[in-house]
Amino acid sequence: MTSTMTSDKVESFLEVVREHESPIRIYPEQTAFISKKLQFDWKEVIEGHFEGDDGHKNFVVHDCGSKESSFVYFGSQKWKLAKIHFHRRSEHLLESKQSKDGSFDAEIHFIHAPVKEPIETGDKMIEPSENLVIGTFVVESSTGAKSDELMSFFSACESGEKSVRMPLEIIKQVTKLEHFYFYRGSLTTKPYSENISWVVFESPLQLDKTVLDPICPTTQEARKGQPWNRRFVLRNFQ
């Protein structure tokens, strides 16, 4: 005898069995210290294009070969930058002087795929995940970055340009960040697969409001915070 389940019932069942979901609210006092580094090898030129429907658009990074691609080193692995997407309010929540009840003005997710290449980083930990996602908060600031390059980058989402360069200002700000929180979770959009290692930086990027406003057509709907359950959330700073 076979049984059938409607999509609604399947979704309800998965809501019960899921235990390692994202995003989460980060409580700094409940995190544990771990000596861990993330090393950037991002190039100054990162090109790609926007694709997807409104409400679920990604900046897809063009594959330009192993020498010109952008990578990070985390754990005992090398990860290649593949996609970037944006949320006009942050998905992760973190109590901070620059947040409002834990929420920031925006959040950017830099999605990296594992590279099957032996490397030596000094860190023996292998991440049991299909992707490493680096999350950076963003705050509106009157002294934040503002440039024609930043404006044209987000405007390109609507223009349909086939090749767009990621603003150097974003690359410079992100690659200077050091302090982060780390946990294992899920995609924040369907199918919410629990195969993501998350690095969420403590300090936000500073951008001018006029830069953030054009982000709206590219943004993905923010998912509500999920319970920690029995997970550890770690930090790499004292």
Question: Where on the chain are the PLM-derived regions?
Answer:
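Alpha-carbonic anhydrase
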Residues: 1-238
